[in-house]
Amino acid sequence: MLIEGRLVDDGRAVRVETDGPRIARIEEVCSAASPTRWISPGLIDIQVNGFGGHDANAPDVTPQVITDLVRSLWRRGVTALCPTLITAPESALLRACEAIDSACSADPLIAHSIPCIHAEGPFISAEDGPRGAHPREHVRPPDYDELGRWQEAARGRLGILTVAPELPRACELIQRGTTDGLLLAIGHTAASPEQIRAAVDAGARLSTHLGNGAHAVLPRHPNYIWEQLAHDRLTASLIFDGHHLPPAVMKTMVRAKSLERVVLVSDSSAVGGLSPGVYDTPVGGRVELQADRRLTLYGSPLLAGAASPLSVGIANAVRLAGLSLTEAVRLSSTNPARLLGLDRAGRGVVRAGASADLTVFRFTPDDEDLTVEVTLVAGEAVYEADSGAG
């Protein structure tokens, strides 16, 4: 396949040729077909609860639901995603793990697009604020044996675990999980600075949606947000949907962590991508999606999750946080690829010999979203805007 456009990395007008699952060559051309048509590494979203009406946390989740979730995000330029399971009874988590594994086993492209599962609960704080929208009745202490049962149901596909380090035996779980090859994250926590430091020493490497899943009011200092910002061993995932973090906080967190240690995530729910309206959801109950993609509890101003794809986060990083398009895409492709170890397979970059996971889109700095034209997964055009594929 031949694709022309400007490389997000350096703005060069190029023709990219793919051969099977790899990029065969990249040649400079006199000028791109359009100065606003960009070629980037495929977008990678490590926190996705659902999208387009497809819910990884639905009580009746099936392999088809997972497949449809992946396909709905191909249309938004996402070539890899981590289906994210929130706090639920063990039976529900096992069922979701089995559904995700079955979807991956049935289709190599789906497997390529799901590098791992992210378990965002249930080993989190039960306090209001840090717990977020997770159901209190299913929050429980860390249990390494239960974690093993999830992994068995997923046939080894579980890759990220978010945990509150103040819980009993949390640091032991972090240490054992890290030894097992999991990426351990701190999130939905009310931990003290000392407990944050202990978690980092035990092996935690990620802060899950830093600045959210937190108390509405915190001590000026010290607190668990400052402590996580200060640790160079922690990468921070951030929700840039325009509602979860104000622009000043977006800018400050990126500057504090540096571009090397930030990953953008959507944290999207199943109502993401749907028309504005009122919806009944498995998590959060009745919610209302506003025209500006703000998702709230019905009749309340309180957020009930996120409803924007990762592409909106990239646009907001440019419009609201002052990043360049190059930087914003890096936080949404190259950085998560490195965090998950996908860079070792040539993902997260556009160069000869790399994996042909590509997103082609149009964008100007005033746009509120990317306009995705082509999505390639392992060299296959899984979405083309003018054909409706995907």
Give short role names for the model-derived ranges.
Residues 1-31, 380-381:
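N-terminal metal-binding scaffold of metallo-dependent hydrolase/deaminase domains
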Residues 97-121, 127-191:
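Metal-dependent enolase-superfamily TIM-barrel catalytic cores that perform enediolate-based chemistry
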Residues 347-390:
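C-terminal cap of metal-dependent C-N hydrolases
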Residues 148, 152-276:
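Active-site core of metal-dependent hydrolases
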Residues 223-237, 242, 254-266, 272-354, ...:
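His/Asp/Glu-enriched, well-ordered alpha-helical/loop segment
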Residues 49-51, 55, 67-96, 113-125, ...:
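Divalent metal-dependent hydrolysis catalytic cores, especially in the metallo-beta-lactamase
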Residues 38, 46, 58-112, 137-153, ...:
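Alpha-helical scaffold segments that flank or form the walls of functional sites
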